[in-house]
Amino acid sequence: MTNPIIAFQNVSKVFEDSGTQVLKDINFELEEGKFYTLLGASGSGKSTILNIIAGLLDATSGDVLLDGKRINDIPINKRDVHTVFQSYALFPHMNVFDNVAFALKLKKVPKKEIEERVKEALKMVQLDGYQKRSIQKLSGGQRQRVAIARAIINQPRVVLLDEPLSALDLKLRTEMQYELRELQKRLGITFVFVTHDQEEALAMSDWIFVMNDGEIVQSGTPVDIYDEPINHFVATFIGESNILPGVMIEDYLVEFNGKRFESVDGGMRPNEPVEVVIRPEDLQITLPEEGKLQVRVETQLFRGVHYEIIAYDNLGNEWMIHSTRKAIEGEIIGLDFTPEDIHIMRLNETEEEFDARIEEYVEMEEPEDGLINAIEEERHEENS
């Protein structure tokens, strides 16, 4: 990693009035120009981290660094960061121009420069021409764009976003995900985004920190975290998962449901108890006699792009399957999957141990070749 723009070194936070510890020895580094997400449920500590970076809260212990310099005692207005709050915190009695220009006016920036910079900021968020519009006459998405324009007009090193999409409807929220991500890429500013929505985190982030009970449970790229969850919490919090108890017989061989299957994981003790994860979309429905497992369909829901089927095997384990075909309740079907579809989780493995094992035993991802090259390669393999 290049020199980090933001770093936390053994940062903890305890609220003195209640004695509640909300952050426990947090360590991380953030590179400049990337989109980071703090992902967790309510009370996990994600917003506390954001507020400590902003200077709205003090760390009880540990160091907070900006460009390698300790900023624990630096006041809010002296930090080169800007926060976009969930409520947007706009001034309702001011129009769009005055809201966006507010910080520049406080700094006594020349009037002509203010006009130029406001126009450029509004153009960035697709609100050019809205300068005189009343805040109260804007939609939720437009208000959010104004808040973002106000955040970027000072060209801060870091923009902090505290669940800014949560108040929007689904369609607008999806549109704003694209806009925020593209804006961050154009500006090259470090974004730190807080959310409880795993789909937002997966869609927008370069790097995700999954939080639970004041700790960072796992960090990595969206693909890393989705494909290789470190433990039961992450596997269930990020997407849907089928999780079963198993035993790692030896490297690349796991036993669950009374059968042994090839896998791509290793680095564990022989006969070590583990948890096995198979995602619903990785299960292929086959004829019963052709499947690696047989299950009986209990119920199903139509989700638009697929049917979500709930089925049970003869040991009573529940299976969720995603299929484009409708099942018949009560019918017995086969389930097929590949070794790459099986993800192994050790019990009580630390992130350091997990990262070391994954690096040694799991195959590295092939470089991205694009869709066309991938299609041509598949056809070549089929014809050879």
UniProtKB/Swiss-Prot annotation:
PROSITE patterns: ABC_TRANSPORTER_1, ABC_TRANSPORTER_2, POTA. Residues 6-238 form the ABC transporter domain. It comes from the Bacteria. It is an enzyme of class 7 (translocase). It is found in: Cell membrane. It is a peripheral membrane protein. InterPro entries: AAA+_ATPase, ABC_SmlMolc_Importer, ABC_transporter-like_ATP-bd, ABC_transporter-like_CS, Mo/tungstate-bd_C_term_dom, P-loop_NTPase, Transp-assoc_OB_typ2. ATP binds at residues 40-47. Its main location: membrane. Its EC number is 7.6.2.11. It catalyses: ATP + H2O + polyamine-[polyamine-binding protein]Side 1 = ADP + phosphate + polyamineSide 2 + [polyamine-binding protein]Side 1. Keywords: ATP-binding, Cell membrane, Membrane, Nucleotide-binding, Translocase, Transport. One of its GO terms (molecular function) is ATP binding. Transmembrane segments: none annotated. The keyword Metal-binding does not apply. One of its GO terms (cellular component) is ATP-binding cassette (ABC) transporter complex. Part of the ABC transporter complex PotABCD involved in spermidine/putrescine import. Responsible for energy coupling to the transport system. Belongs to the ABC transporter superfamily. Spermidine/putrescine importer (TC 3.A.1.11.1) family. The complex is composed of two ATP-binding proteins (PotA), two transmembrane proteins (PotB and PotC) and a solute-binding protein (PotD). This is Spermidine/putrescine import ATP-binding protein PotA.
